[in-house]
């Protein structure tokens, strides 16, 4: 259940009786990229293509209401992740629209990158503690 704020809007939600409360939700887009000839990320063509795709979509993602965008890259396990975090209310509106049209477009282009695999999406709570 959500806890109303003093102004009547929703501020926090609880995950049952777990003691976990949150006010922000992130939509994560992730994949595995292939290492370059060196065996690492520095010369990875697929990592460069992932970054180029994110650069293309970043202005559109930042236009989402109250969105913050983070990127995580692991050079050891070859992860490329993008998280779009919004307060509950704003995220709910985007989720209600099936994350369209940005997610469908981005994921289709991500899947088309040579060397990219395990393309997935996930909705997660995201809190600074």
What function would you assign to each model-found segment?
Residues 3-80, 85-104, 109-129:
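Short S/T/G/P-rich N-terminal loop/turn motif that feeds into the first structured element of a domain
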């Amino acid at each position: 259940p959500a806890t109303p704020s003093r102004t009547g809007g929703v501020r926090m939600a609880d995950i049952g009786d777990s003691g976990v409360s949150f006010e922000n939700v992130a939509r994560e887009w992730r994949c595995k990229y292939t290492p370059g000839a060196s065996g690492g990320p520095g010369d990875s063509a697929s990592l460069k293509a992932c970054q180029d795709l994110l650069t293309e979509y970043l202005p559109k993602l930042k236009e989402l209401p109250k969105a913050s965008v983070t990127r995580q890259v692991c050079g050891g396990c070859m992860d490329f992740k993008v998280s779009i975090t919004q307060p509950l209310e704003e995220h709910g509106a985007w989720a209600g629209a099936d994350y369209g049209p940005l997610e469908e477009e981005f994921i289709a282009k991500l899947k088309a990158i040579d060397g990219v695999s395990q393309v997935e999406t996930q909705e997660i709570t995201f809190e600074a503690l």
